[in-house]
Amino acid sequence: MSKKKLPPSSHSPLSYRDAGVDIDAGNQLIQRIKPAANRTTRPGVLTSLGGFGSLFELPIHRYQHPVLVAGTDGVGTKLKLAIQLNRHDSIGIDLVAMCANDIIVQGAEPLFFLDYYATGRLEVDIAAEIIEGIAHGCELAGVALVGGETAEMPGIYQAGDYDLAGFCVGVVEKERLIDGSQVQAGDHLIGIASSGPHANGYSLIRKILERSRYSLNSPLADQTLGDALLTPTRIYVKPLLQLLEVIEIHALAHITGGGLPENLPRVLPPMLSAEIDTSRWPRLPIFDWLQREGNLSEQELYRTFNCGIGMVVCVDQADTEQALEFLKDRGESAWLIGRIVPQTSDGQRVAFNTGNPL
């Protein structure tokens, strides 16, 4: 039985580009970003951008029992402010910071990083600016940008919108893993300064902006409100890796969404709590502005934002001064902000006790 031939279509021919996906633009982007990615290379990188998989040779000879540590994160709705201000050069630093700072918490050295960039329509200049920022963040963290994915998805994202995700892998000697098990009552807590809200709390920030009389161009201290809100997240990897070589760190906490009250308990053993003295570090003007314009309680402020502390280092009392001096010598602002105490009967894991002697 002969097959019936379908009649020819009366429609004009279609291409992938007609559907909103420009393969040529994607290829152009890869060529644009290769020099930036190449600047991040480090021993172990075996491939360049453009392949199916990225290869990294683990320096196995340096370890007795190597443990891989992986992390993934995004930038959240801070992206909306970058898009609104048409400033895309530093949002990639935030992406690397959110991943690499999580990796260092376990004591791991970040090795390589991959990114995922999704948008409704690929604008090569904007995408290149973003990924060059990612590469700069990788340089700050000492991690290699070995690959990524650019997804052009018309109909999923509105015009001008995009999203980012990052993936980071590091390595640590098993016997040197930092898991909080060494934390004990009497340990001191050192806070390392943040540069602002970092990449957390921006849904609340945008809500405050909506009802505020201020614009992103309004002055705030010695910069604009937009500048303060787009200041990239600090990357703590290099100074902390160096600090690990000179003192024993009992725990590290990356202060992200949920602030000190939500992140410190993640690294505390049962039956121990953290006592924090908020008078021991200066609060950046942006946090005072957010509290005033949002009419935020102290509790809401501290459980939403980092409030000036981006990383907490838990050490033995005897190592406090050495750790503080070491961090300050490497350009970090750091303060003794609290201590570890036995958990009280009310079960509170983080207590704010302004003015108490440490």
Curated annotation (Swiss-Prot):
Its main location: cytoplasm. One of its GO terms (biological process) is adenine biosynthetic process. InterPro entries: PurM-like_C_dom, PurM-like_C_sf, PurM-like_N, PurM-like_N_sf, PurM_cligase. Pathway: Purine metabolism; IMP biosynthesis via de novo pathway; 5-amino-1-(5-phospho-D-ribosyl)imidazole from N(2)-formyl-N(1)-(5-phospho-D-ribosyl)glycinamide: step 2/2. GO terms for molecular function: ATP binding; phosphoribosylamine-glycine ligase activity; phosphoribosylformylglycinamidine cyclo-ligase activity. Disulfide bonds: none annotated. It is found in: Cytoplasm. Keywords: ATP-binding, Cytoplasm, Ligase, Nucleotide-binding, Purine biosynthesis. Belongs to the AIR synthase family. This is Phosphoribosylformylglycinamidine cyclo-ligase. The lineage of its organism: Bacteria, Pseudomonadati, Pseudomonadota, Gammaproteobacteria, Chromatiales.
